[in-house]
């Protein structure tokens, strides 16, 4: 296994099975963040993640963290909070604000550089990247964004500026996703936060099999149309 240098003149990726074991999942470096290359990466179970100033690094870890939306863990306190939630939740109302929020709300720094913001904004304009927004009145207080692959959603990042805002985004999205035929959410790498929400690890080969099936599936044509998903009770 060796790290592959990508060419700017080809969008081809090596097989994810050739990714390094240490660091886990590192597959290639270089290339660019053009929409065509990004979409090719997601279709093959590969995603970019790198530090500012470093070359673009491409990953496909084994195992892979996923969340079956029907297995989302909702604590009793979160259930009580959601019943009296002050938040309004929308889809695709403010993609730019959400990704900017994810970039700025990281005390330890972020991989979401200006170039990354612009790249995913292009994907959004092409109808492939989507956002969930959480509002307190007219203030954006949390949200999440990711890339759609048929009935699979590749979650990229979330942020929260008020209590339970990002959890509300995920809860409302999972409910809507399930009701319209969504099957699986890719969480990439398991951490304490995603594990607490019900995410689990599966072998990479299983994830790739699910991806190959689900990316050919279809949600309703109007699923990603900008709309309100949840409003607080009066």
From Swiss-Prot:
Q: Name one GO biological process term.
A: protein catabolic process
Q: Name one GO cellular component term.
A: cytoplasm
Q: In which broad location class does this protein mainly occur, judging by the first location in its UniProt entry?
A: cytoplasm
Annotated catalysed reactions: N-terminal L-lysyl-[protein] + L-leucyl-tRNA(Leu) = N-terminal L-leucyl-L-lysyl-[protein] + tRNA(Leu) + H(+); N-terminal L-arginyl-[protein] + L-leucyl-tRNA(Leu) = N-terminal L-leucyl-L-arginyl-[protein] + tRNA(Leu) + H(+); L-phenylalanyl-tRNA(Phe) + an N-terminal L-alpha-aminoacyl-[protein] = an N-terminal L-phenylalanyl-L-alpha-aminoacyl-[protein] + tRNA(Phe)
**Keyword Nucleotide-binding on entry:** no
InterPro entries recorded? Acyl_CoA_acyltransferase, Leu/Phe-tRNA_Trfase, Leu/Phe-tRNA_Trfase_C, Leu/Phe-tRNA_Trfase_N
> Per its UniProt record, what Gene3D superfamilies does this chain match?
Leucyl/phenylalanyl-tRNA-protein transferase, C-terminal domain, Leucyl/phenylalanyl-tRNA-protein transferase, N-terminal domain
**Enzyme Commission no:** 2.3.2.6
One Pfam family cited in the UniProt record for this chain: Leu_Phe_trans
Keyword line:
Acyltransferase, Cytoplasm, Transferase
Q: Where in the cell is it found?
A: Cytoplasm
Q: Which domain of life is it from?
A: Bacteria
The molecular function terms in GO held by this entry are: leucyl-tRNA--protein transferase activity
Q: What class of enzyme is it?
A: transferase
Family the UniProt entry places it in: Belongs to the L/F-transferase family.
Functional summary from the UniProt entry: Functions in the N-end rule pathway of protein degradation where it conjugates Leu, Phe and, less efficiently, Met from aminoacyl-tRNAs to the N-termini of proteins containing an N-terminal arginine or lysine.
This protein's name: Leucyl/phenylalanyl-tRNA--protein transferase
């Amino acid at each position: 296994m060796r790290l592959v240098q990508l060419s700017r003149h080809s969008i081809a990726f090596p097989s994810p099975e050739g990714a390094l074991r240490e660091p886990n999942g590192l597959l290639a470096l270089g290339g660019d963040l053009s929409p065509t290359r990004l979409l090719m990466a997601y279709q093959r179970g590969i995603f970019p993640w790198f530090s500012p100033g470093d070359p673009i690094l491409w990953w496909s870890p084994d195992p892979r963290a996923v969340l079956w939306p029907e297995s989302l863990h909702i604590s009793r306190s979160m259930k009580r909070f959601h019943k009296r939630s002050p938040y309004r939740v929308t889809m695709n109302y403010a993609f730019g604000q959400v990704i900017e929020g994810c970039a700025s709300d990281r005390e330890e720094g972020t991989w979401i550089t200006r170039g990354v913001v612009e790249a995913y904004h292009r994907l959004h304009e092409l109808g492939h990247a989507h956002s969930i927004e959480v509002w307190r009145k007219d203030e954006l207080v949390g949200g999440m964004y990711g890339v759609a692959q048929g009935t699979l959603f590749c979650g990229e990042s979330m942020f929260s500026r008020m209590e339970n805002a990002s959890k509300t985004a995920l809860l409302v999205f999972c409910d809507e996703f399930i009701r319209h035929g969504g099957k699986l959410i890719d969480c990439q790498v398991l951490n304490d936060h995603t594990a607490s929400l019900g995410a689990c690890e599966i072998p990479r080969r299983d994830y790739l099999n699910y991806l190959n099936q689900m990316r050919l599936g279809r949600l309703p044509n109007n699923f990603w149309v900008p709309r309100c998903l949840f409003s607080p009770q009066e």
